[in-house]
Amino acid sequence: MKLALGFVAALAAASMGVSEALAEVTPRAGNLDARVRYAQWVDGQVYRIQTQMGRVTSVEFGPDEQITSVIAGDTVSFNFDAVPGGSAFVMKPTTSGAATNINVYTNKRQYYFEVSETPAAQFSVVRFTYPRGSGG
């Protein structure tokens, strides 16, 4: 019986670790302005971005990256545009309360986002940083 309880406890602990690992990450606020956000790239991570009606949000990747594809679930409630240079794009919500996912592919990495329009706490820019050895 003790062995069975130990197994159940270990299984529960392992499943909690998996759910935490799959959680979305909100990019951290910059030191000077909370609207400037920073996210460390992690393969397979989903990043949460908050947008606001009437405002654009930029997403900036490493200077050596070129965007090859931006795919969004809802292309009616959000507008997307490339930024010259190819390592950034902007998004702007057109519908209040809209939410979608966006997958971005570059010549080096893949990025996954959950984006929502909210009247509070809009991000002006999300800038990615890269761990050593990730090619960034």
Report residues per predicted region.
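Bacterial N-terminal signal peptides that target proteins for export
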Residues: 1-8
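C-terminal segment of classical bacterial N-terminal signal peptides
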Residues: 13-20
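A general "mature secreted/periplasmic domain" signal
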Residues: 21-136
